[in-house]
């Protein structure tokens, strides 16, 4: 009997809603929390009887808020949890100490709960348990941070979600809704799941194996084959940027044709687009790693003049950003 079969059996035998614990910490990612809870709420809404009952929890209990200024009251973590599912929500600070929940995860797993880790929660678990995390994924920004730090958990897939049987790791953010629709599908008819998706205006439920866009190496689709190929090569060559002349040669179009396509589809030039991709990548590393500013510039293909380019684009020097952040994590 699979974990899902067991969970279904428990719900049917006890005649109660499935219990869901949602663990958050100060600075939690609001879009992920709402993605989890709103799908559960919609599933309950369209079923004759409630299928799910959820509880917000945190390490210390009490009121917990997110970066958007909203928050909720939470109950303290239970030493003997009785939930069927537990979600650990991502956080604006990837280094938040309350994301280190190895013992809590073990307590839930021991009691046969399905554990689902989103974005920063996934990357923290991957980092702290590289030998026991099996196949895994996390948000592409977090993956980049793990790799630049030389973290042993830096290697893994760029899928939206990975289920290793015991723990589900997920990229979080917008993929949270896909994850949740897949989960409620274990307890509802296909028609009910589609109705839930339709209410949310979620046209297509993406498979777990779907690659994340951009950092996940799935091409951003503009509808122009040659333009998409060029963008894909740009994304693959951030540290060692290719000259535009080489890009057009590989794709088989002229430089003028590429410029027209970028202007028509994206209202920019190839060089500007490429530079902004690399600057945004550099900004992620600046906020979330301890690499020196020079090392970040090198990692993003800026051999010289990185600080001035960064300042002209973001309006502030990388030194000021690094000082202001003081080690804080991803901005969500």
Regions found by a protein language model. Name each.
Residues 269-274, 292-294, 315-324:
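Short, Lys/Arg-enriched C-terminal cap helix and immediately downstream tail that follows
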Residues 157-201:
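Conserved anion/nucleotide-ligand pocket segment
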Residues 288, 299, 304-332:
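…primarily DNA-binding HTH/wHTH and HhH modules…
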